[in-house]
Amino acid sequence: MDNIFSASWIKAARQRKDVVIDFKKVFEAKPFPVKAELQISALGVYCCEINGKRVTDSVLNPGWTDYNKRIQYQTFDVTSLIEKENTISVGVGIGWRFHKWYDLSSKIISYGNVALIAAIKLTYENGEEINIYTDDSWTSAESTVRYNNMYNGETIDFNFRPGKFIPVKVIPYTKDTLIPQEGEFITEREVIRGKELIKTPEGDTVIDFGQEITGYLAFYFKGNKGDKVTIRHFEKLTKDGNVYTENLRSAKQTLSVISDGKTHFIKPVYTFYGFRYIAVDGMDISSPDEFVAIVVHSDMKRTGYFNCSDEMINQLFHNIVWGQKGNFLDVPTDCPQRDERLGWTGDAQVFCKVASYNFNVEKFFKKWMGDLRAMQKNSGTIPSFVPTKYDDDGGSSAWADVATILPWQMYLTYGNKELLRENYILMKKWVDFMRSWALKKKPDEGISTDPYLYEGHWHFGDWLALDLPNKEAVEGATDKDIIGCAFFAYSTSLLIKASEVLGIDCKYYKNLYKNIKKSFIKKYIDTDGKMVCNTQTACVLALHFGLYNEKEPLAKQLTELVKSFGHLTTGFVGTPYLLHVLSDIGENDLAYELLLRKEFPSWCYPITQGATTMWERWNGYKPDGTFATPDMNSFNHYAYGAVGDWMYEKMCGIRQKEGTAGFTDIVFEPIVAKAMDFAEASIETKEGIVASRWEKSGEEVLFTFTVPENTAAIAVIKGKKYVLNTGVNEIKA
């Protein structure tokens, strides 16, 4: 058992709500240990120093979990920091433990208070071990960070004097929930200098960083004693060039600093912000580069790249990547700025494929799937966002289906059977829940009693689709029961595939899948072979999930719908699959037409409005310069970035052979665009870099495919198959 389990949870004897607490312990170490190891965690987020030096470059530890079920602890080698006389200092802020959606108050530790647990083990050459634990010998005091909140920011008062450190209280908080670090650490990844200094018509001093980011500022501040600088972080300017913060809802996103007359380097520690712009009050600024924005996200290795001859599509890919950077902080969140920032399951499942191409997210999602398992109800349902404090029964199709889609996609990308096995029960329990729901429906509920249809449950629907007259509506026109039944079939099919990979008998589920399809066709496909619900998303789901073998009528229906509107109308549910389906039915020109479209609604429309990340809504900022409803209008929301996997798989043609995983057997089949000169993409797999490029050369196209060691590959060009060799392969056609 790790050393931390011998330590005690401690809290300050006195603590004002929302103030950062500094914990301290002075100890001696006889010269000199050959190894010193620190294990540490907190109810809140911590920043730890030994003898004035940070023990890690990671931030916002211990990360975000459901603290009632799982709390990560970290282990650091601190050998180089140990001296004869030592002081360990740990600042702890409230972090993710207490906020609007996640208040874990209890009698042991009330709202706005924090706690710490830590253990240091000193090991000497002769084998002797000395341990220092958190206990009642530690002391604490309030810090100069007088306020901290994940949504609202920090207030730092350098005039505050903490006074005497006083003994802490040991609290009987459980250690049963402590687990070793599972996910990637959150770290500072990039630094962006201010690009433009703006004086708004309303008189605000604004700095534009030119890129929407998630992170915080760093700058030097000196004022007269008592001077206060207040900095607001936000995403957009109005059409008149003024500060726009309404879409943050109740989140303040503010940093306030009160001067003691000395120069200080300012960098928040216990919070993060989502922003492109800052508005500075109380400080004279002569140049925008007096401020830098520090980008933070989980420490994932970049693995996927894309480039083409169309700069707007390059910007789209840039926005997809930055949407991922801005929302992958230990948990895949929907947005990083407003009073939400939650691990919405639907957003994660639609984006997980392209996420796994852009970055190595195996460890990141392994941790979050642990969160999913911890929060899955006994019934099998998954809450709508994870972690959560709410007794949310979940069960919305396309959201709770993260239980099957995410584990399967991680297996496909990385080929890790053990990770799939670890989450098999997660998958099975969700499918079993839908089956049990279908079985228990009653005639008086006004819905079908067909035992193979997942109907009558609540669902979010095709979220933010544009196929209702009211473009501010959120649920879309697609029948929610169609979505429910389609995903019931799809999740069952994925469970069957997982069972076959793991050697688990799945005859029951194969029979179940056959009957779900039969019932789906009977109720939702008309006598002409078309969907009874005449929406793009309904057709897309039936085609992409293979729910009806006679595809031609459905393909015609979808094509006519897209052409009649002249644009996509899909929301969160249909959009990820739309271009894939159009390509699969031979409508490649139509797929490219949608991708390249610059007018609203489209993927490129936000780029014409200066977007540097993906938007939550197709109409977040309208052509007339007005905003969509501020109740739900994030400008950093990655879900629609799911189109990126079509860019990898169809435009550049990198896909895996059916029935394989881990990119061990590849089929290159790129779709050349009439309106583009070249396109290229690469994905770093466990065996090496897989790359594809096509470039027009007169009447011909030069295809270049790169195949790593231990990888089989073919190319399919104009219907002809080519067996490829390891290394670089060129084909002209």
Model-derived features with residue positions:
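Extracellular/oxidizing-compartment recognition motifs
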Residues: 1-338, 346-347, 363-366, 383-388, ...
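Heptad-repeat amphipathic alpha-helical coiled-coil interaction surface used
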Residues: 411, 489, 495-496, 513
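Active-site acid/base region of carbohydrate-active enzymes
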Residues: 45, 141-142, 288-319, 325-326, ...
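C-terminal capping/lid segments that line or modulate ligand- or cofactor-binding pockets
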Residues: 88, 154-157, 339-340, 358, ...
